[in-house]
Amino acid sequence: MTKVDKVKEKIIETSLYLFNTNGITRTSIQDIMTATELPKGSIYRRFKNKEEIVLAAYDKSGEIMWSHFHKAMENKKTAIDKILAIFLVYQDAANNPPIAGGCPLLNSAIESTGVFPELQKAAAKGYDDTVMLMASLIKEGIEKQELKEDIDIISLASFLASSMEGAIMASRVSNDNIHHQYFIEQIKHHLYSYSK
């Protein structure tokens, strides 16, 4: 990695933390300069504007989360175990989420809707990608004869992704992981009802 790349990566990683903990609108270029200890010129040589930094930081958050999801699924044998492993990535959503500040998808969706179309589009794609991951695992479960064949795959996948985001939000806003625990408990019952 070149020196320029390292500086750009530092800007992205630092900005991701700031945006996800303080919010996009509450984070200024000056905040990024202070946190990175870089002058304005170093930032603007790499990014046209704050919006470009936001989009790069959001992309980075996706890479980080997908890495967590794949690592969680590594030694799981069944589709249900893989799905539950993904959900357990956020088991301490209130105090110790995988990325400080909570779920970048949820935070970005809330901050972007109606005001930042490019980020809203990226967040919508992030949600769709999560639904498709769930759908691929459900399909895998059907193909391996772990799950019943009459499942509406996309409907269940969307329900699972939406429920996960809701559980993360409830745990974060209440500062209590009990909501994520309830989610896991209920989702287990729901998923096992589809077992063969």
Swiss-Prot record:
Molecular function terms from GO: DNA binding
SUPFAM superfamilies membership: Homeodomain-like (SSF46689), Tetracyclin repressor-like, C-terminal domain (SSF48498)
DNA-binding interval(s): 28-47
Keyword check for DNA-binding: yes
Gene3D superfamilies named in the record: Tetracycline Repressor, domain 2
InterPro entries in UniProt: Homeodomain-like_sf (IPR009057), HTH_TetR (IPR001647), Tet_transcr_reg_TetR-rel_C_sf (IPR036271), TetR_C (IPR011075)
Superkingdom per UniProt: Bacteria
Classification via PROSITE patterns: HTH_TETR_2
Domain HTH tetR-type residues, every copy: 5-65
Assigned keywords, A-Z: DNA-binding, Plasmid, Transcription, Transcription regulation
Pfam families reported in the protein's UniProt record: TetR_C_13, TetR_N
Protein's name according to its UniProt entry: Uncharacterized HTH-type transcriptional regulator pXO2-48/BXB0055/GBAA_pXO2_0055
Species this protein is from: Bacillus anthracis
Lineage: Bacteria, Bacillati, Bacillota, Bacilli, Bacillales
